[in-house]
């Protein structure tokens, strides 16, 4: 029972942090005092569940990594067409961000500007993992479909991920007015025409 209550409180703290990141408070630095007030506990109670604020952010980053990488792997298992795989991975990241605006502040690095550098490193590593997956998908086209691209796969992967990151940054910069998936089909038509 006590373990379950501790897990629930940890989740409650992480959910409160994500909600604060989504609100106007997320545009500025979130203190443990503000977070404790949001959760309805003392700062000391926060530290019983997490040794530091950085560990709270790491908890959210772990959730983001798990959610995105699990779904990307599922796409790779289920879909074999190269361009469809790329389209689905792009849409996955954009839709995830749209559904989780507070977490998008973490993905864009905005929420981590004044936090521990290792948090920014974790997000950079996540994007590097995604870019590596994109490069692999693009490389496999020769094997799967007997076709190659007019440009190196590493350049295409960087261009694709740059499009995604630009959409995430625009979403955060606009205070979540410009939805990342808005006009996705048109953007995809433009991008896929360039890389076919």
Curated annotation (Swiss-Prot):
It is found in: Cytoplasm, Nucleoid. InterPro entries: Homeodomain-like_sf, HTH-type_TetR-like_transc_reg, HTH_TetR, NO_SlmA, SlmA-like_C, Tet_transcr_reg_TetR-rel_C_sf. The keyword Calcium does not apply. Signal peptide: none annotated. The keyword 4Fe-4S does not apply. Residues 31-50 bind DNA. Homodimer. Interacts with FtsZ. Belongs to the nucleoid occlusion factor SlmA family. This is Nucleoid occlusion factor SlmA. It comes from Vibrio campbellii (strain ATCC BAA-1116). The gene is slmA.
